[in-house]
Structure formats: C-alpha cells, structure tokens
Amino acid sequence: PAVMANGVYPVKLTSWKRTGAAAALEQRLAAGCVMAEVVIRTSSPAYPLRHNGKLCFPTGEFTTILCTDSLKYALQQGHVHKVNQYLAFTAAPLFSSWVDEFYPLKARYKAEGNEVWEKAIKLLLNSLYGKFGEKRALEIFRGPDPERDFMRANTIVDIPTLEDKFPWTLTAEFQKQLPYVNAQEWSFLGTYCITADVPGREEGPMSMVPVAAHVTDQARQLLWRYMLAVGLENVLYCDTDSLIIEEQHLSRLAAHLHETEL
C-alpha cells in the first residue's frame, strides 16, 4: 500500500523496441512506464536478477529486466551499459482509490480491536496487485458436485493421469521418482475441482504482469532508498518490506515513519 497509494502503473502497451539507446529510454520514461532488458554494470546490489529460481541482487556486469523506478535509478547512476529491448506503456494511478478506501478501514478495525476484519482488509490491500501476475494452476478435473460442502485440501494425482496434460517430467516429484504429483482439491458453490501447480503454467485470466512487476519494483526501490539513508553498513537484515537496524540509526528514518500514515 505504501507505493500503491501514489504510484503510477502500466496501462496500455504503446511500443516494443528490440534495441535502443539510453537517451531513447529516458524519453520513454518521461512519458510513462517502461520495462527493459538491460546490461547492468554496477558495484551496488540495487538491481534484481532471477537466478536458478531465486531472486538475487548481484554486483558486476549482468543482464536483467528492470521496471520504471529501477531503470530511472540505473540511468541516473550511469549503470546501464546496454539496452537490449524495451516495452513502453501509458501510465495511470491504478491503485490509489483502492488504498484510499481500504487503508482507513483497516485502521478503523484495528482501533476497534476487530482482528478478523483487520486481517481480512490487510489481505485485500496486500494481495490485489499480485493477481495481475498470477499463474493459473493446471486444471486436472472440474465438474458439478452440488452435494459436496465447501472445502479445500491437499491431495495427490497419479502420473499416468497427467502424462497427456503437462510436462510431468519437469516436476520435483518426478525427480524424486515418485509415482504421483502433489495437487489441491476444492469445492465451492456446487463445483468440484482438482488443480496442480506445475511447470509451464499459463498466466491467469485478466493478468498483466507489468503491473505486478512495477509494484514490487517500486517497493524494492523504496526499501533501497531507506537502506542508503541508514547506510548499507548499518543494515543487519532486509526482507520484502522491512529492515532490521540498530536503534541508534532509527533517527535517520524518522521523516519516513508514522504510526498510521503511509
């Protein structure tokens, strides 16, 4: 919510360039949102790179994909060595009204001591953006079952059932030589379904990955600015949305801290 309240996000794709200069990238950034595959040269661990399924923040020279905020910072620092390709979008504040509606509601339920609704609203606030980048689980079975109660549970599906549905040889279960794949079964409003999270899944309906990518990019850049304010040598640990520092350095972030305001 801290970045969603005031940030702007990709709305409509306007161009795709296979190559480009840094100057052209700056022009696009001034007009809207951009995602770019770039070669980075840096001594600062400020840029994300997915390596072997893990998110890393390396130094040196590497190729990665950056969103608007990280691109602006990289260009300002002179860390963009080469632009391989980029996507340009128009931009709009997609989540401002969402945060304006639900953040005060969360504060209200917290003040009332209503933990159930406070946590429910917190989930709504924090999870909406991820829906734009969500992958669809492989649907193994779906059918009517009006007699079954609402439920959700883990289950297993034998490999022969799945051989024609997805590349099962890529699953962790296959690597362990197991004869089944882990799956989930659920029932809701008269429909029964079995799904599995497997390699090669498609994007979910109504997805737009650049939106979700920009939210996480803005959050990482905000966290990076806080780390610079504290001093990298004083950061003991950082995670998705938090820092662990010694209390003596807290005053350096005083202007950014508030009990209730974003």
Which sequence ranges carry the predicted segments?
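Conserved acidic
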Residues: P1-L262
